Design a protein with these regions (language model features):
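Catalytic core of pol beta-like nucleotidyltransferases
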Residues: 2-57, 68-75, 87-186, 190-195, ...
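Short hydrophobic/aromatic beta-strand micro-patches
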Residues: 82-86
Length: 302
């Protein structure tokens, strides 16, 4: 198989004009409200699939979510795509996204957002099985090497797999946030920063767990946000108000969490870390509302 250049080094694929679209889609849209149905250009989607096939030689490509007329996924208008490869993919999902953006820039597309999942056959048979069954049973198969056998999504099991993760991770996030408030009041800003970072990660894991009925091996806060950036424009804007496409708050918390564990000097300023505690509390409220709305949707499908 030919080697795909590392386009992540040749361009910062995060630097795109996301915020105008995100602000427009967030305005007037309640938390957890389903995205408005939008028609897509089959030619545009066909070109996206062609680029994906050039890069990773997939087993199949599935369109799911609102654009497929299925259970809504992204609140932002986006191509929700699940790409399945026979073996371990030759690149990571963010590398494929960078390659796709290089070959078919968002400015050239009517729908600029692409929510891309790249999984092996082994992953969709195990860790991602409930998410895969939902996407395959309701979505549109855009490409497949072989005839696809659709199995109905068992929303009973999907619901409880999602609920278990929500209760676990949101509970842990609440504990970390409470401890962070106590550390802040005691003037231990090093510990406050560490606990706030842990709370933010648990919240993002709760959101991932509810939407995918699965765990993730991602732990860097900025990468977790990038992984789920199309789920909620309101969350995206809350965590990156500087509109840098690389959340300063999450970047700083990633650094503080590492430094608090391994460096003698880790001295965040009270004003900075106090602001992060407050914003993480708002993040908690928003993610809990998103998760409850999503769980209610699954419950209706049971």
């Amino acid at each position: 198989m030919k080697t795909i250049p590392n386009f992540l080094q040749e361009q910062d694929f995060l630097q795109e004009d996301l915020f105008q679209d995100a602000e427009e889609q967030s305005a007037g849209q309640a938390v957890g409200q389903l995205a408005t149905a939008v028609n897509y250009d089959p030619g545009e989607l066909g070109r996206i699939v062609a680029v994906i096939r050039q890069a990773v030689d997939p087993e199949r490509v599935v369109l799911f979510g609102s654009l497929a007329g299925a259970t809504p996924f992204s609140e932002m208008t986006a191509y929700d795509l699940l790409v399945v490869t026979p073996q371990h993919p030759p690149m990571e999902w963010n590398e494929l996204y960078g390659y796709l953006k290089f070959k078919y820039p968002s400015r050239s597309r009517a729908i600029s957002f692409i929510n891309l999942y790249l999984c092996s056959e082994a992953e969709v048979a195990n860790r991602m099985k409930w998410f895969y069954r939902m996407a395959l049973s309701e979505g549109e198969v855009l490409y497949s090497r072989e005839t696809v056998v659709r199995k109905p999504c068992n929303y009973e099991k999907f619901y409880f797999a999602a609920l278990d993760r929500y209760e676990l991770f949101s509970g842990q996030a609440g504990g970390f946030l409470e401890a962070a408030g106590q550390s802040l009041a005691a003037g231990d800003f090093r510990l406050t920063a560490f606990q706030t970072a842990c709370a933010a990660e648990m919240l993002l894991h709760a959101l991932y767990g509810v939407y995918h009925a699965a765990d993730t091996d991602l732990h860097t806060l900025t990468t977790l946000l990038l992984r789920m950036r199309t789920i909620s424009p309101e969350l995206f804007l809350l965590l990156d108000p500087e509109q840098s496409c690389n959340s300063r708050m999450l970047s700083r918390l990633d650094v503080y969490r590492r430094d608090a564990l391994f460096l003698f000097r880790c001295d965040p300023y009270r004003a900075e870390i106090g602001g992060y505690v407050e914003r993480t509390q708002r993040m908690k409220g928003l993610i809990e509302r998103l998760c409850r709305a999503r769980l209610s949707l699954y419950d209706e499908c049971r």
